[in-house]
Amino acid sequence: MFKLKLLSISTIFILAGCVSLAPEYQRPPAPVPQQFSLSKNSLTPAVNSYQDTGWRNFFVDPQVSRLIGEALNNNRDLRMAALKVEEARAQFNVTDADRYPQLNASSGITYNGGLKGDKPTTQEYDAGLELSYELDFFGKLKNMSEADRQNYFASEEARRAVHILLVSNVSQSYFSQQLAYEQLRIARETLKNYEQSYAFVEQQLVTGSTNVLALEQARGQIESTRAEIAKREGDLAQANNALQLVLGTYRAVPSEKGIKGGEIAPVKLPPNLSSQILLQRPDIMEAEYQLKAADANIGAARAAFFPSITLTSGLSSSSTELSSLFTSGSGMWNFIPKIEIPIFNAGRNKANLKLAEIRQQQSVVNYEQKIQSAFKDVSDTLALRDSLSQQLESQQRYLDSLQITLQRARGLYASGAVSYIEVLDAERSLFATQQTILDLTYSRQVNEINLFTALGGGWVE
């Protein structure tokens, strides 16, 4: 008889939680093409398929790796993301605890006496244990726990996304700072050249080989360049501030090195890059976990329409003497099965289910939006790869031509064949082209970083 009762109780506990009313999860189809359109010139071939080589291998410049490591230790955004993971884990533990039996102990003392003092004061001691357990036949508690578990996984992916964004921001801030250094250096070199030209024109004015107009034009070029230097100094100060902010520390930032020193290993891509690679991005994985949590919430909302069964049992003992509280004959036991059947709640359960279904639909849309946005990120960076390389090659050839043009213009001006305005035009074009090449070099570095992170790189070290 005892074995039969034990078997019945065990069966109840096994059945509790076996049923789930949550919809069966099916990953929504990706609303993007199966493959990216790749230009042959934009590829650095990979052996088989794309693999994240790790950010330490991607950034060849050791200075960048050092700064990224420092930021990972000090950045407040990353620290906050880690705390949110701990928060989600704690929330899951709180919710999951409701699925298991709850055992509580209690003790107390009661004093009784007459209001007029005509009766002696008596005291009674009591102590007891109470065990309660909700039979989760329809999976309400299980689905609530599952929803928080999926939200915990989503918070982990959110932390990965912050990590990757931080790697990207640190590297881009560093290259932006190096760009500002290089732009300032070229502006200062240009100023020296203009000052030499001014001295030459001034000498020619003394000998009568030129006029005051040419001298004033040379002076104007000097003042214009000084203004440009002041602007570049301001840009450098702002770049240093931005780098310190993303690093999370206000120690000294790297000094001038030159933008060409910040080498990046090209992202290696296979000939046929599948869009399925986007599924490894943390923002998309976060959206998928949120979708799974929304499915579980539907299951919990559906279970609210069904009866809730709670079993409570306890042992208690009471006595007027503390010494005899646990003696034979002073104890009692109780067993209280309780069933709650929802009959009328003004449509609350229906509204909760409708709310859960709408949020699940929102999660599907959010998941699809994340994939489309990720597809655009990768497609944009791939499209820019060729464009930036071609622009750089053309600008470099143009720079070579301008250097020859400037030399000839100076020679012709010295012989009196052309006016000084020809020299000024050549110098201005040369300076502007040098700045353009720097901007394009920086843009190509940033684009390669964006491609690296758009494919989910930046998490593996």
From Swiss-Prot:
Its main location: membrane. GO terms for cellular component: cell outer membrane. One of its GO terms (molecular function) is efflux transmembrane transporter activity. It comes from Salmonella typhimurium. Component of the sil cation-efflux system that confers resistance to silver. May be part of a three-component cation/proton antiporter. It is found in: Cell outer membrane. Belongs to the outer membrane factor (OMF) (TC 1.B.17) family. NCBIfam families: outer_NodT, PRK09837.1. It is a lipid-anchor. A lipid is attached at residue 18 (N-palmitoyl cysteine). A lipid is attached at residue 18 (S-diacylglycerol cysteine). This is Probable outer membrane lipoprotein SilC. Gene3D superfamilies: Outer membrane efflux proteins (OEP). Residues 1-17 form the signal peptide. Keywords: Cell outer membrane, Lipoprotein, Membrane, Palmitate, Plasmid, Signal, Transmembrane, Transmembrane beta strand.
